[in-house]
């Protein structure tokens, strides 16, 4: 379930555009007005506001927000205002364009996250947006930017179009659990069978396969993968893929937790988790967070951030400022 709260009566896109224009006109910026408009509009409404703003004022709202706002608040508002497919395409492009030594494993996990926690239609939209924005296919850019074992996995995951209904086949699950087990025992995590299964089967079928794996071999597949010798980075990305496929809400609960735990805050990761899930399943993420860490996600977040950034994030969490 989503957490954002859209008012019962919403102004027209033209009226919202005027409110935003007034909020950034002259000296100073009315950040609260920006939050009240954009933070309480759904994807379709935000798209219409952006279109209306361009028609009326001849400027891209994204460009205006980027120039008038600053810091983590600006990045969060801009990310939220983008069409989701464009947002994810730009996020992946930023990761792939980093210098080789700066392409950290944590960055690459974001590509896995996008590939394994979004709908088939959204992933297609991301690939289309990528081609349109960057004159390259997402798959080509991955293949040319990363070493073979990692590129092979990420291209497979990013190029999939999964069946999205909940029909499953128990016999297929048993057979493919055995194929996965064999590949792990042979220390072949990049075996074609592994990639074929993870890259073609529906989310529901894969979950059935993971259940069959635990039932037949007495251990979860992610633990078996974790104990497999070989490429540590490949092993880590496979574990993230399995986690995202099996329990996406737990994955994002962990992203939130990791972003605020310890010294300092990883605002980029926190923003990504909240912005990308606020219209999808952030309510479930909130519940999983409590189950996993025995504390309120909202309280943990708000105790770690401040200012306009905090006001915007709590608005996406469903609170009023």
UniProtKB/Swiss-Prot annotation:
It holds the Pfam family Annexin. This is Annexin D3. The gene is ANN3. The modification Phosphothreonine is found at residue 117. Annexin repeats lie at residues 11-82, 83-159, 171-243, 247-318. InterPro entries: Annexin, Annexin_repeat, Annexin_repeat_CS, Annexin_sf. Belongs to the annexin (TC 1.A.31.1) family. It comes from Arabidopsis thaliana (Mouse-ear cress). The modification Phosphotyrosine is found at residue 289. Keywords: Acetylation, Annexin, Calcium, Calcium/phospholipid-binding, Metal-binding, Phosphoprotein, Repeat. It comes from the Eukaryota. Expressed mainly in roots and flowers. Lower in stems and leaves. Ca(2+) 1 binds at residues 26, 28, 68. A pair of annexin repeats may form one binding site for calcium and phospholipid.
């Amino acid at each position: 379930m989503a957490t954002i709260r859209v008012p019962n009566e919403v102004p027209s896109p033209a009226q919202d555009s005027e409110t935003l224009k007034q909020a950034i006109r002259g000296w100073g910026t009315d950040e609260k007005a920006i939050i009240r408009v954009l933070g309480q509009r759904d994807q379709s409404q935000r798209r219409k506001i952006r279109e209306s703003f361009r028609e009326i004022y001849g400027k891209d709202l994204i460009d205006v927000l980027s120039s008038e706002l600053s810091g983590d608040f600006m990045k969060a508002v801009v990310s939220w205002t983008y069409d989701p497919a464009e947002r994810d395409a730009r996020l992946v492009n930023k990761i792939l364009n980093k210098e080789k030594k700066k392409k950290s494993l944590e960055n690459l996990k974001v590509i896995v996250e996008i590939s394994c926690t979004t709908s088939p239609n959204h992933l297609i939209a991301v690939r289309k947006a990528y081609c349109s924005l960057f004159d390259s296919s997402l798959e080509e850019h991955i293949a040319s930017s990363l070493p073979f074992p990692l590129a092979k996995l990420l291209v497979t995951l990013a190029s999939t179009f999964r069946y999205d209904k909940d029909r499953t086949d128990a016999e297929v699950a048993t057979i493919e659990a055995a194929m996965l087990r064999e590949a792990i025992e042979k220390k072949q995590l990049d075996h074609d069978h592994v990639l074929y299964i993870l890259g073609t089967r529906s989310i529901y079928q894969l979950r059935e396969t993971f259940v069959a794996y635990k039932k037949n071999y007495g251990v979860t597949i992610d633990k078996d993968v974790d104990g497999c010798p070989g490429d540590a980075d490949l092993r880590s990305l496979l574990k993230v893929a399995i986690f995202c496929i099996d329990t996406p809400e737990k994955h994002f609960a962990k992203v939130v937790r990791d972003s605020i735990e310890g010294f300092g805050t990883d605002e980029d990761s926190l923003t990504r988790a909240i912005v990308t899930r606020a219209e999808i399943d952030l309510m479930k993420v909130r519940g999983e967070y409590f189950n996993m860490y025995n504390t309120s996600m909202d309280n943990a977040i708000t105790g770690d951030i401040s200012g306009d950034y905090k006001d915007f994030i709590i608005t996406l969490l469903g609170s009023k400022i």
